[in-house]
């Protein structure tokens, strides 16, 4: 057996066992690596003023304030809301809602009977039990998310500290030319920077828009604005987790116009205008004006890759989706610019 074949057999065996050993941490390592790549320009800026260990720690501290603090805020506020529910008032609210729904559905006999049977099992006790189940699930999920976040932060320090060495090593190991490897890396890094900044600005815009509106109705605009901005990152439901309960609360107190305004404002101004119209425009602005990058990737493709990533990978899909898309497009462009051209030259 040739030494080369023997080496590749040993390498594949070792690679399999490495994947098996670290399979529970692969996603965390991937997220840490992507965050490091997207945030590395900040590290380069800090390196000019501090030692490597200090700048690495400061980068981790900044990301920790973005990842851990908001998560703690959500868990703390959500648990307070659930455990401070007044059962008597909540029962009255459910009874009132059932009456309103039954009264309006009486004009539609075809669905009235089915809805009535469904509402029979719809009570304050059942909803409270459901909320407690949700809170326990959220508690378990939040604990896992916090554990993953702490592990990611630990890996982030490692990646920031040895980032330059990792970069040079991978450029040398990849079976491509140095310029080809750099172009792939620059394309992925550029997309990550755009996505991270776009997501941060969108969360701030949506949170501020909701907080400024809701404060006029006597609610805590600061807390609800933060919760809405963070809830906007939740796949499928987003800010509806915040504005629907508030609209129901206003309805219960007879404030029909206020409830309708909150619903329309949240749907039309925030969900449609900010999330669906302003966000793609923001991607274009950040790409061309802030980073002044020459990336040849359509802005709408970046936008849809973020949506697809969230639907497949949850919260972290915001960066995983665009990364996969950018990497694949970079490979296609590499194939087009180098391999096809070389084949054409060989034919000539």
From Swiss-Prot:
Keywords: Cell membrane, Membrane, Transmembrane, Transmembrane helix, Transport. It holds the Pfam family AI-2E_transport. It is found in: Cell membrane. InterPro entries: AI-2E-like. The keyword Ion transport does not apply. Its main location: membrane. Coiled coil: none annotated. It is a multi-pass membrane protein. One of its GO terms (cellular component) is plasma membrane. The chain crosses the membrane at residues 6-26, 27-47, 56-76, 143-163, 194-214, 224-244, 266-286, 300-320. Belongs to the autoinducer-2 exporter (AI-2E) (TC 2.A.86) family. This is Putative transport protein HP_0567.
